[in-house]
Each structure stands twice: as structure tokens, then as C-alpha cells.
Design a protein with these regions (language model features):
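Outer-membrane beta-barrel proteins
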Residues: 2-13, 23-233
């Protein structure tokens, strides 16, 4: 559940070309795409692939006005559910030196459509960034992946990112999930990550993940590390 599927090579080749759509205001659209292989898929500290590798990818369209929309995909392991497709749209703008991002994110699981419980979910979010720091608030307008009350589950996060060199970046993350209507399921997640820019859009990643959710959903919240190799277009 990401924020985060392997797009066909044909589609990726098309998406790496910037879109230049001009209207009367000479506004521009630009596109980007990404694909990666991960040792496992984690969502806010929780395992999504039962320790199995994940292939993930997506694409984005952004407008010079600040509007954007995109799609992100991954394999998952939830019983009969094997695919996650995320669709999002939002608006980014600046207030002085602070960057603000507001938007809507829909988590869609094609294998789960029509089943009970329905784990397809929707959240709205607001994220503020200043220098090396960012903080975000996410609010579910539906049930939290088929769990809890009709709406009201929330997630708060704070992040720090520091470029050690031109090719190495270190980042730290802390998040807090408040699961509405399910006693004892609130938890926090933490991570420290290292990113290695290999040039030409290639990157290596190493994430160390921990959380306080062992009592909520069992082994899905075990601590661990994730290794990744990705390509951006």
C-alpha cells in the first residue's frame, strides 16, 4: 500500500520523453516513470509480500501550475490478492521557503473487487517540506483496508534527508498510525535509509525498518532491512 508493478517496456519508453502540451498560458506537462526490484515490500513499517521480493513501478504527469497525477503499482501477498494499484492526484505550491503538497490517494486491489472485506481504500493527505525536513498528515476517508470504522484512521510522519555526497543520501523517517475503531492496533514505524545514485537514473537503496506494531498484526510488523535497485526515466 504505497504511497508506491512493472510497467511494460513499451510504456516506459514512451514515458521517458517529456510531454510538452501548450495551451494559451503556455503551461507545460511533463512525464516521468520509475521501475524497481525490492527484496520485499513494506508499507508504513508492515510487510506486504510475506518476505518475498517485489517488482514496483509507476508514472507521473506534472503540470507547471503545480497540478499532478500518477499511478504506482506493486505485487502483494494478501491471500488471493496479488496486485496493488495506487492512483493519486494533487497540487503542489510554495509559501515562502515552505513547499506544500495536498492530494488524494486511492489504493486499488483488482483481485479483491467484490469481495468481503473490501480492502480498496482512499486517503487524503497534506505534506509540508522545508529544507531537509518534511512532515505529513494522511486521513482515510474510507475504512482502513477493510479494518476499523467507516473512516477516520490517520497517519502522521516526519522525515529528514541529508546528501552526504553527490551520490550518497541518508534519510530518517518516523511515522504514527492511529487505527480508528480497533483497540490496540495503533503503532509507530521508523526507518533509516541509504540511497546510492549510480548515474543515468539508476539507484541502489538500503532501508532499515523497525516499528512498535508486533502486538497488532503479528509477524507482518517484524523489523528488517530492504535492498532495492531502481531506474528512473
Amino acid at each position: 500500500m504505497s504511497n508506491k508493478f512493472l510497467t511494460s517496456v513499451c510504456c516506459i519508453s514512451m514515458l521517458q520523453l517529456p510531454l510538452a502540451i501548450t495551451n494559451s498560458a503556455n503551461a507545460e506537462w511533463e512525464s516521468s516513470a520509475n521501475v524497481g526490484v525490492f527484496s520485499e515490500y513494506r508499507f508504513r513499517g508492515a510487510k506486504q509480500t510475506e518476505d518475498a521480493p517485489a517488482i514496483q513501478g509507476g508514472f507521473d504527469l506534472s503540470h507547471s501550475s503545480g497540478l499532478y497525477l500518477g499511478n504506482w503499482n506493486s505485487n502483494v501477498e494478501f491471500g488471493n490478492t496479488s496486485i496493488e494499484m495506487d492512483f493519486y492526484a494533487g497540487y503542489g505550491f510554495n509559501i515562502g521557503d515552505i513547499s506544500i503538497d495536498i492530494g488524494d490517494l486511492y489504493y486499488y486491489y483488482p483481485d479483491n473487487s467484490g469481495q468481503t472485506p473490501n480492502i480498496n481504500s482512499n486517503e487524503i493527505y497534506a505534506i509540508a517540506s522545508y529544507g531537509a525536513f518534511s512532515a505529513g498528515y494522511h486521513y482515510f476517508t474510507t475504512e482502513w483496508f477493510g479494518v476499523g470504522d467507516d473512516s477516520g484512521t490517520s497517519y502522521m510522519q516526519i522525515n529528514f534527508e541529508y546528501p552526504v555526497s553527490e551520490s550518497v543520501t541518508i534519510s530518517a523517517h518516523a511515522g504514527s498510525s492511529k487505527i480508528e475503531g480497533v483497540n490496540g492496533s495503533d503503532y509507530e514505524d521508523y526507518s533509516v535509509s541509504f540511497g546510492f545514485d549510480m548515474g543515468d537514473g539508476y539507484a541502489l537503496g538500503l532501508d532499515f525498518i523497525d516499528n512498535s506494531g508486533d502486538g497488532a498484526v503479528g509477524s507482518a510488523f517484524a523489523s528488517g532491512a530492504v535492498v532495492s535497485f531502481s531506474k528512473s526515466f
